[in-house]
């Protein structure tokens, strides 16, 4: 390999991304497509998925993105997502699990059972399910990459986002166990742990003028992240540039956890 940029080339790879129609997930999918991968855009709303796929194709100048809607909380929809990806694009080389929810802000002592179950089902169990579905093909070809979006919240206690943080800490355990189980099959599994980015999902954390100013002051870079800043991160984790990295948690939060 004579050119360093070849390490980041994903040409011909099939990447299935969940929670990728807007926000951070979209930026992650954009990065993969820019690097040459064929990308599945997936979230609950079909029209938004189609729009995102079309805009990514316009951006890269060719048809690299397709839309397959899916609610990851339902096992049968995940199975259809995996099967349709395989039938339309081929075996999955890269699985990027980004879908997540947080329907509750407040003390974990007050969270209703329904909200707790929804967080754990979407943020943890769905990742377990889809990995089970994708791994057989990766094992057969002895090659594959899985990335699960966790959070810097997995490393910090929270008085308002406690249950969400618990789910993201569980994702780290899932990543490490999958990495340990499947390393002998040349399957790498890592976690991406972002901080606060300017997305609709995190708007309550950055869109409150007084509170957001205080929060930004706690970040080493003194600002919140822009979704586009995750494009290169997604490519690194999915590419040969990270070929000797597995079972790790890559924190991308502007230095917030470092100074907690």
List each language-model region with its residue ranges:
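Short C-terminal tail/terminal secondary-structure segment
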Residues: 2-6, 102-105, 156, 235, ...
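Conserved glycine-rich cofactor-binding loop
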Residues: 14, 19-23
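Substrate-binding pocket helix/loop in short-chain dehydrogenase/reductase
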Residues: 106-108, 112-117, 215
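Active-site loop-to-helix junction immediately N-terminal to the catalytic Tyr of the SDR YXXXK motif
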Residues: 111, 157-165, 177
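Active-site helix of classical SDR
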Residues: 131, 167, 175
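Alpha-helical segment proximal to the catalytic Tyr-Lys
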Residues: 136, 180-184, 243
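Residue(s) in the substrate-gating loop at a strand-loop-helix junction
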Residues: 151
